Swiss-Prot record:
Subunit record text: Forms a complex with DabB.
Functional description taken from the UniProt entry: Part of an energy-coupled inorganic carbon pump.
Protein name: Probable inorganic carbon transporter subunit DabA
Residues reported in the UniProt entry to bind Zn(2+): 346, 348, 516, 531
């Protein structure tokens, strides 16, 4: 009998352990990754939750993390009262949403005057905080978040601190050891008995999870939700851990960091309970269990309460879609003349105004849109460094290498190493413990020049940083080129890219590959303004590598056998669109034949005129005078790009709202306001639908990520944005930022990226994707990819197509005609 009892207990413990492990894994799976500062790409922070309907996710985020997913009601009230949302938009939104059947227009309008926030479900640290006898400056939540965050900053830092700590076998072990030896934290938290709880901490993460869950004694059905709520209190660091896991191979230790973080944050609540075993704590504990027993009911109520917010979200989008549809159906199409030149731009929304201006200035120029990595899925290693960095979308792994090549690499590498070593030694000298006094007294005046450069910014050109430490004589001949590929592989890549660009036949004599990059000073989040398709880098490396490949004589000789008919005179030129100043810079011009160089030079006045046109279009949003002389306006933007005190060098992708996958004839001359991503696609050339599938599963997902990062950072800037840029402190050299000197790691966009000081510049609209393809072809792609089914069926984006009779929208798996003249069309 005794043996049977022991076996039963062992089985029960094993079952409980398995359920805890499953709940922890489920909670961790809900966290989206956040890329580091030097590779910053936009991410939908709800990406791991898109398998659920949007409103259900909004309800869960509100109750589990106090996070707002839909636009705040006060902003919707402004849009309603200002006429941005019309009565027709509201009526159509109510008609479109089946769950809004019981709502009247008057109910929706009345809801705008009521607070839209929902009370989150409490965590153990929250109910313990309700003890009236506790007197401290910080809540338990604030104190614990700060301690966990500082621990993570020390553990993950590999670049910033000169004195690195011993990290031990993992994040949980590091935290436990840190807490055990920190004898002052109990005093700071007003818990002199904290050491008792710390001593009770289990040695391993798995035991800590079981220990903490045993203390909580929640019903099994609430475990995963409670654990997800725990992670959301340190969502920034959780997102960083998710990124490390995203990048790591199976079985790597980096895949365990997120679970370690969950165990740390979970264990803190149990530690507090160990320290506060009194009547108040027991009463608070009972209240916690009562609240979480009602969690399923609370979630259902929250989802119903948010129906009105979903209605207003759609109403806001319908107003924009009406305008978009009208502009698309009025687009006049391409001119009949054969283009004298072609310019391939990134699909980025900032390319749209420049493409429009170039075509208006020179009708014989044809512009094309393509993902900014130009089909070169490479990692780039600058000359003489080990700094291998991705130059492709974050969803993809690098498949090839780009390295710098030049005539005398040995001498250049030696010279660069020498200069970089001197710079590193100088920097380390300034960080000596006594340097805070002696260095400033002796050499502080030497920094007056740098300070003056910020107070009176100059008009210096953009510096990519890839040539830092390289003597000037080597820079013009240092070229990023594909390496390690055979002629057959290089030719196949060239053919693949040319077909995707639509240039397999009839290329112009001059084809410009125009990447893009931003220019700013003293900006920790500068990479977020560069090319997302190049993993937060500029498109220079990809454009140059591809142009050099396509101009290679051996590759050109091999292309006809692969079905590519490039005219012999066609020459490719790599260029970069500076999105801060709207200037275009060319590269490797010294390698061009005389005829091609002459053609490039003839286009320079067109670039200048088009750039001036775009600068005047952008000037009012930047507080500049659009009527200023051309040179004065350009000078002002150049100085802005070098101003270390400028928190808004440009607006980035603020305002993004649509993605058009279609021939340029569908959008040419349509004034899309810099709000649309544009990718060229000709369905007639894609007979098997393979290119359409690629576009819907790569660029479409990237634009969705961008759209939702801007949406989330606007709707909840405190929890899903990075706060005030003026208060940013860089963590770990490149990991992310703190707002101030602590708190959670901040993810998302800063307030200055979305708000001009008076009003919000970005409108939180779900992306409207418009595709020129048969409905059957689109449905075939959707049917093959569950991620697309989830995004569409669960309301994360809108999908339209160009039909024979006009625009059509997809709704509930069916296609409906759009009337471009009707409200909400």
């Amino acid at each position: 009998m005794h043996t049977d009892t022991l076996e039963h207990d062992a089985l029960a413990r094993a079952g409980a352990h398995a359920r805890i492990q499953a709940a922890c894994a489920q909670a961790c799976s809900a966290i989206a990754p956040a890329w580091p500062l030097d590779r910053a790409i936009a991410v939908n922070p709800h990406w791991q939750r898109t398998g659920q309907p949007l409103r259900r996710v909004a309800a869960r985020m509100a109750l589990l993390g106090g996070i707002q997913v839909f636009p705040p009601r006060e902003r919707q009230r402004e849009a309603w009262q200002g006429g941005r949302i019309t009565p027709q938009d509201l009526a159509l939104a109510l008609q479109r949403l089946p769950d809004a059947a019981g709502l009247a227009e008057a109910d929706c309008v009345a809801a705008l005057d009521r607070p839209g926030g929902l009370q989150p479900l409490p965590l153990l640290i929250d109910v313990l905080d309700n003890d009236p006898a506790r007197d401290t400056r910080l809540t338990w939540r604030q104190a614990i978040t700060h301690q966990v965050s500082q621990t993570c900053a020390a553990f993950f830092d590999r670049a910033q601190a000169d004195w690195q700590p011993e990290r031990g076998p993992g994040l949980y072990a590091f935290w436990r050891d840190t807490l055990t030896h920190d004898h002052g934290i109990g005093t700071l938290m007003g818990l002199p008995g904290l050491h008792r709880g710390v001593q009770a901490l289990p040695a391993t993460r798995e035991d800590a999870e079981a220990w903490a869950m045993h203390h909580l004694q929640l019903q099994g059905g609430a475990w995963a939700d409670y654990l997800e709520a725990v992670l959301l209190t340190v969502n920034g660091w959780a997102s960083w851990c998710a990124y490390l896991a995203w990048q790591a191979p199976e079985g790597a230790p980096e895949r365990e960091h997120l679970r370690d973080l969950l165990a740390i944050r979970l264990a803190w609540g149990a530690v507090l309970l160990e320290c506060k075993d009194d009547a108040a704590a027991r009463q608070a504990f009972a209240a916690l269990q009562a609240e979480w027993r009602r969690a399923p009911e609370r979630l259902q109520q929250a989802e119903q309460a948010l129906v009105v917010d979903e209605v207003w979200q759609l109403a806001l989008e319908l107003g924009y879609q009406r305008e978009l549809a009208g502009r698309l159906v009025r687009a006049p199409g391409l001119p009949s003349a054969v283009p004298e030149a072609q310019a391939v731009f990134c699909i980025d929304v900032r390319s749209e105004p420049l493409r429009r201006a170039l075509e208006a200035t020179a009708p014989t120029l044809q512009t094309l849109g393509f993902a900014g990595f130009f089909g070169v899925p490479a990692a780039y290693t600058p000359l003489g460094t080990a700094a291998r960095r991705p130059q492709l979308p974050g969803l993809l792994p690098p498949a090839m290498e780009v390295t710098d090549q030049l005539p005398d690499p040995g001498a250049a590498v030696t010279a660069r190493h020498r200069r970089l070593a001197w710079a590193a030694q100088w920097e380390s000298t300034t960080r000596w413990p006594g340097a805070a006094f002696s260095f400033v007294e002796a050499l502080g005046a030497g920094y007056l020049g740098k300070l003056g450069g910020w107070l009176w910014p100059r008009e210096q050109a953009r510096d990519s940083g890839d040539h830092a430490g390289l003597p000037a004589r080597y820079r013009p001949v240092c070229r990023p080129m594909l390496s390690g590929l055979s002629l057959e592989e290089r030719a196949a890549l060239a053919a693949r890219v040319l077909k995707a660009l639509g240039l397999a036949r009839g290329a112009a004599p001059l084809v410009m590959l125009v990447g893009h990059g931003s220019q700013s000073a003293n900006n920790a989040q500068a990479a977020a303004l560069d090319c997302g398709a190049c993993c937060g880098q500029t498109g220079e490396v990809n454009a140059r590598a591809l142009a050099l490949l396509l101009n290679d004589a051996e590759v050109r000789t091999a292309l006809p056998a692969l079905g590519i008919a490039l005219p012999e005179a066609t020459c490719f030129v790599a260029a970069l669109h500076n999105t801060t100043t709207d200037e275009i810079e060319g590269f490797d011009l010294d390698l061009l034949p005389p005829e091609a160089r002459a053609r490039w030079e003839r286009w320079q006045p067109v670039f200048s005129a088009a750039g001036d046109r775009v600068r005047r279009e952008r000037a009012p949003s930047l507080g500049l005078d659009a009527r200023a002389a051309a040179g004065d306006l350009l000078s002002a933007l150049r100085r802005r790009a070098n101003d270390g005190a400028q928190t808004r060098p440009e607006w980035g992708l603020a305002g993004n709202a649509a993605f058009v996958i279609a021939p340029r004839s569908r959008t040419r001359d349509a004034e899309l306001g810099g709000r649309a991503f544009l990718h060229d696609y000709d369905p007639a050339q894609d007979t098997d639908g393979s290119l359409l599938e690629l576009l819907m599963t790569a660029p479409m997902l990237v634009t969705h990520w961008i759209n939702w990062q801007y949406h989330a950072s606007t709707c909840d800037p405190e929890r899903l944005g990075s706060g005030n840029k003026l208060l940013h402190n860089v963590v770990g050299g490149h990991i992310g930022v703190f707002e101030g000197n602590g708190g959670d790691l901040r993810i998302g966009l800063s307030r200055q990226s979305l708000h001009d000081g008076q009003r919000w510049v970005h409108e939180p609209l779900r992306l409207t994707v418009v595709i020129d393809a048969p409905a059957a072809a689109i449905e075939a792609v959707i049917g093959k990819h569950s991620v697309l089914q989830q995004l569409l069926d669960h309301g994360w984006l809108h999908l339209w197509r160009f039909g024979d009779a006009g625009l059509e929208r997809r709704e509930g798996g069916r296609w409906f005609a759009q009337d471009a003249g009707a409200s909400g069309a």
